[in-house]
């Protein structure tokens, strides 16, 4: 885990300063997870850690949009299907909020 944190700093993913989070709370650091996608080796390291935490699963689904690449990668690693969650239910076509056979 220490190697992963060091890579976060090396790739400028952990920022220090004054930040307002989505919740409105203030923080003196920020982890910009969307930058992880730019670094394949780091993406693999993060997904390896996520994979270790999953005990048993028939499907995987990431919270849109930021977690979808992580879910996709872990799904490929584990050979399990990915469910695609939409932020909002579609009002056309099949009108689904979740795409996939579950």
Which stretches of residues belong to each language-model region?
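Short, glycine/charge-rich flexible loops or terminal/linker lids adjacent to PRPP-binding catalytic cores
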Residues: 70-102
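Active-site-facing substrate-recognition patch
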Residues: 1-53
